[in-house]
């Protein structure tokens, strides 16, 4: 067991409380720089896929009969205004009867078109094309397949040819979601309610955490998280309650038997679910698999350096977002070398080609962005901290890549604003709680900045005193942040009951 670093070793205070009194962020004890669809049928008597969603509108005088919600209780805003799209960074347009009718007049949508109304990514057409293929597959009866592993409802999403192209994790089927199809967390809640959930995380924000981790990864230039965004999908293989399925069957029956009534429905089919969609990566294995092999058969020096560089990027990502669920089974390694299958002698020996590559994929980022440091039962440690790679000091390559960004406070402020635009789309968004999440992240960035400057190793990084960097009430709110009075720091000294370092 590694003992947690005591901030009292180098800071004033006795550490008996939860935190020391706030001090000005520019005190002498703090580093000088804080952060340096077309019509699908000729008539209304079309045959519908069981899991498809269809919106019907007779004319501009059609009556919108209802606005349904998906399993998570969130409104399914399926009729955007005349602008045509709803981006994560855009404010939600006021939905009046006039603009809802004008946007849907004389359109007979194909199955699944209602979820497609949300899934517009003009800034990333390649990702949008992948989502379109996923929607087409569902329309054609190639439904997502539930993943057996894990404690939540997550699904392999396929293209029309049946090839896996992504992993979809609906909000309503998260580990503590009310429509989670797996019983593990239900028994946890019933049998051990005192330990239910993670007290440092906001419930049911896993899908946002997944997408936000991808955003942080891109902003820092790490490129180890498969691209992840928030999308809306509907499929009969998702877990819906009995009422939603009964309503879907009733509406489809009414549409087929009584078209005049059926065409007045806002949507026919199951409601789309909001969740995170992460691109599927091929050729990767769990880290445990390769780490054991690398231990038995050491890598050549150039490959070892590549692995160390990729590992350090994983450390940077996990530390900044304070991932509370990083084991060696939810990050992946891909080792590429020529001649696989062609070696006839000494196949167990590693080759040393120039075009070989080791890559890491950081998946399962849904339990990150806590609003406080873990201080109750468990510490939720980073399991990579016990690997031999964690004992090696951060390389110059990593310092050159990351330090110039996180040392710039305006870069950090821009990152917080981008995360705000993403998180505010959630129905249960709380600005106060979000600011607490950002305070933890700023503290993590502060520690990482100092560790990179001091040439520390990942294991030394996780042993640094935990810091929360909060915006001062008197601090400015503009984009250009002044260091003098913008933030204050607090050392978080309360330890979890079970500590890991």
Swiss-Prot record:
The keyword Disulfide bond does not apply. The gene is pi4k2b. Residues 1-30, 65-122 are annotated as: Disordered. One of its GO terms (biological process) is phosphatidylinositol phosphate biosynthetic process. GO terms for cellular component: cytosol; early endosome membrane; endoplasmic reticulum membrane; endosome; Golgi membrane; plasma membrane; trans-Golgi network. Its EC number is 2.7.1.67. Residues 76-88 have a biased composition (Low complexity). Pfam families: PI3_PI4_kinase. It is found in: Cytoplasm, Cytosol; Golgi apparatus membrane; Endoplasmic reticulum membrane; Cell membrane. Residues 147-153 are annotated as: G-loop. Residues 141-471 form the PI3K/PI4K catalytic domain. It catalyses: a 1,2-diacyl-sn-glycero-3-phospho-(1D-myo-inositol) + ATP = a 1,2-diacyl-sn-glycero-3-phospho-(1D-myo-inositol 4-phosphate) + ADP + H(+). The keyword ATP-binding applies. It is a peripheral membrane protein. Residues 182-195, 285-293, 377-386 are annotated as: Important for interaction with membranes. ATP binds at residues 154, 169, 278-281, 292-293, 364. It comes from Danio rerio. Residues 17-27, 99-117 have a biased composition (Polar residues). Residues 362-382 are annotated as: Activation loop. Residues 322-330 are annotated as: Catalytic loop. Keywords: ATP-binding, Cell membrane, Cytoplasm, Endoplasmic reticulum, Endosome, Golgi apparatus, Kinase, Lipid metabolism, Membrane, Nucleotide-binding, Transferase. Belongs to the PI3/PI4-kinase family. Type II PI4K subfamily. GO terms for molecular function: 1-phosphatidylinositol 4-kinase activity; ATP binding. This is Phosphatidylinositol 4-kinase type 2-beta. Residues 174-176 are annotated as: Important for substrate binding.
């Amino acid at each position: 067991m590694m003992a947690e670093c005591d901030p009292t070793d180098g800071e004033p205070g006795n550490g008996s409380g939860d935190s020391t009194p706030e001090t000005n962020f520019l005190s002498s004890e703090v580093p000088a720089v804080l952060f340096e669809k077309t019509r699908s049928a000729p008539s209304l008597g079309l045959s519908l896929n069981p899991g498809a969603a269809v919106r019907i509108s007779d004319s501009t005088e059609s009556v919108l009969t209802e606005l349904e919600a998906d399993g998570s209780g969130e409104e399914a805003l399926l009729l955007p205004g005349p602008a045509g799209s709803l981006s994560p960074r855009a404010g939600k347009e006021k939905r009046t009867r006039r603009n809802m009718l004008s946007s849907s007049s004389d359109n007979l949508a194909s199955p699944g078109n209602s979820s497609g109304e949300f899934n517009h990514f003009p800034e990333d057409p390649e990702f949008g094309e992948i989502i379109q293929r996923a929607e087409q597959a569902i329309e054609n009866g190639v439904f997502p397949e539930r993943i057996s592993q894990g404690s939540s409802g997550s699904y392999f999403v396929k293209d029309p040819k049946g090839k896996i192209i992504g992993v979809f994790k609906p909000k309503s089927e998260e580990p503590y979601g009310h429509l989670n199809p797996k019983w593990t967390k239900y028994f946890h809640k019933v049998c051990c309610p005192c330990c239910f959930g993670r007290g440092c995380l906001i419930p049911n924000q896993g899908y946002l955490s997944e997408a936000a981790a991808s955003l942080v990864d891109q902003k820092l230039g790490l490129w180890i998280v498969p691209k992840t965004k928030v999308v809306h999908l509907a499929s009969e293989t998702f877990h819906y309650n009995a009422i939603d399925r009964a309503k879907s069957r009733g509406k489809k029956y009414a549409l087929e038997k009584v078209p005049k009534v059926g065409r007045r429905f806002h949507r026919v089919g199951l409601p789309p679910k909001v969740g995170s969609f992460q691109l599927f990566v091929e050729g990767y294995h769990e880290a445990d698999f390769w780490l054991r092999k690398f231990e038995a058969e050491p890598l050549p020096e150039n490959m070892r350096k590549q692995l160390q560089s990729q590992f350090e990027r994983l450390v940077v990502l996990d530390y900044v977002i304070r991932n509370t669920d990083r084991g060696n089974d939810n990050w992946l390694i891909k080792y590429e070398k020529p001649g696989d299958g062609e070696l006839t002698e000494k196949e167990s020996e590693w080759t040393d080609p120039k075009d070989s590559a080791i890559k890491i994929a950081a998946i399962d980022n849904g339990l990150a962005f806590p609003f406080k440091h873990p201080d109750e039962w468990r510490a939720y440690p980073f399991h990579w901290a016990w690997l031999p790679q964690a004992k090696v000091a951060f390389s110059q390559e990593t310092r050159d890549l990351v330090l110039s960004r996180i040392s710039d406070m305006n870069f950090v402020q821009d990152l917080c604003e981008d995360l705000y635009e993403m998180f505010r789309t959630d129905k249960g968004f709380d600005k106060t709680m979000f600011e607490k999440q950002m305070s933890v992240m700023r503290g993590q960035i502060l520690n990482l900045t100092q560790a990179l400057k001091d040439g520390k190793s990942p294991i030394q990084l996780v042993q640094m005193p935990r810091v929360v960097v909060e915006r001062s009430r008197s601090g400015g709110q503009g984009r250009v942040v002044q260091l003098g009075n913008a933030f204050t720091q607090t050392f978080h000294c309360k330890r979890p009951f079970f500590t890991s370092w």
